[in-house]
Design a protein with these regions (language model features):
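Active-site and donor-binding regions of nucleotide-sugar-utilizing enzymes
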Residues: 25-144, 150
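Short, structured helix-loop element that forms part of the nucleotide-activated donor/catalytic region
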Residues: 217-231
Length: 341
């Protein structure tokens, strides 16, 4: 991050008069991180610039608190990470925390910092930390959410429903399957994918309806090919990653949503619809994921998928809007006082 020399002290002026404060949004490019970062940014109602980051090896293999010479660890890619500095930064994930802190330092302490997820180091230097309940992080600057913040809103769902209006003609019920993949906690083998595909095929054969399925990058080419081979003959669609992304349209049209257990982000997005959410169990897990899944079951949001589809509802808690309003008020208050640190 050579564009952030340690001696740089340039900054943008506070937003004047009725001008909206401006933000930079930092994330590592992973879809879940990007969704959370953009969701919070959109919820503030402030203009922002998205700045995906690239973390170079060997730093990419280490937690940020162990990085030596961090100015060389990260690049903003095609986006400049130099002055003029924004009024505030939204950083998502630990890999974005280091550049966020360096921006604050380079701005002379004038740029306000909001961090999504526990940075696990130098927490007192962030003005706001938005952390999910299962992280068990508490403090005067911590805003606790039920799951992950996200981009799902009623307006976006309705707009995407209209944009992909041809999908509305599919036979009901429409079952949506959101398939993730292996991560540090879970394993998604081809055998387990075959079991999931067979369960979905059995459901559609017995009860009719349609399937809208989207794999993720972590599903892998072989996994996606398997799903297509076993489920491609049923009414519906399996997104191949090309063209416009129908993800939000799928959520809007769903009668029930099935999500693999590895993704807090996708489960949180599904839960923002108020529709039945089934979790497809995978091998593995850890204490943090178990806390999340237990919380979602206790709230009446999710149930394990056992081969049948039922109907239930639950109150939608819009933590993203709450976090966005909190951050916006914090930024405006800081600017209104003529200070940002």
């Amino acid at each position: 991050m050579a564009s952030l020399p340690a001696h740089a002290v340039c900054w943008s002026r506070p937003a004047a008069g009725g001008a909206e404060p401006k933000a930079w949004v930092l994330h590592d490019g992973k879809p879940g991180m990007r969704s959370q970062a953009l969701g919070l940014a959109e919820a503030t109602g402030c203009p922002f610039v998205e700045k995906p980051l690239r973390v170079y090896p060997p730093w990419s293999m280490l937690p940020p608190q162990l990085w030596l010479l961090p100015r060389y660890a990260i690049s903003g890619g095609k986006s400049s990470l130099g002055p003029p500095w924004p009024d505030f930064v939204i950083a998502c994930g630990r890999n974005a925390a280091i550049p966020a802190l360096r921006i604050r330092r380079a701005s002379g302490g004038r740029t306000l910092l909001a961090q999504i997820q526990d940075p696990r180091f130098r927490r007192s230097e962030f003005d706001l930390i938005v952390a999910p309940e299962h992280d068990r992080l508490r403090g005067p600057r911590v805003l606790v959410t039920r799951g992950a913040v996200h981009r799902v809103t009623a307006a976006r769902l309705e707009a995407e429903r209209r944009r992909f209006r041809s999908l509305a003609a599919l036979p009901r019920p429409i079952v949506v399957a959101l398939i993730g993949g292996a991560n540090k906690a879970y394993r998604l083998t081809l055998q387990r994918l075959a079991e999931i595909a067979d369960a979905l095929a059995g459901l559609l054969t017995e009860h009719g309806g349609s399937l809208l399925l989207t794999p993720s990058r972590r599903t892998g080419e072989r996994g996606t090919t398997l799903l297509r081979a076993r489920l491609g003959g049923f009414p519906g669609a399996i997104w191949d990653g090309s063209g416009d992304n129908p993800y939000f349209a799928y959520l809007a049209l769903a009668d029930a949503i099935l999500v693999t257990a590895d993704s807090v982000s996708m489960i949180s997005e599904a839960a923002a619809t108020g529709k039945p959410v089934y979790v497809l169990n995978l091998d593995g897990g850890n204490a943090k994921f178990e806390r999340f899944h237990a919380m979602m079951r206790a709230a009446g949001i999710t149930r394990p998928f056992t081969g049948r589809i039922e109907s239930w509802s639950y109150p939608i808690r819009d933590d993203t809007a709450r976090a966005g309003a909190t951050l916006r008020a914090l930024v405006l208050t800081r600017i209104g006082r003529g200070e940002r640190a």
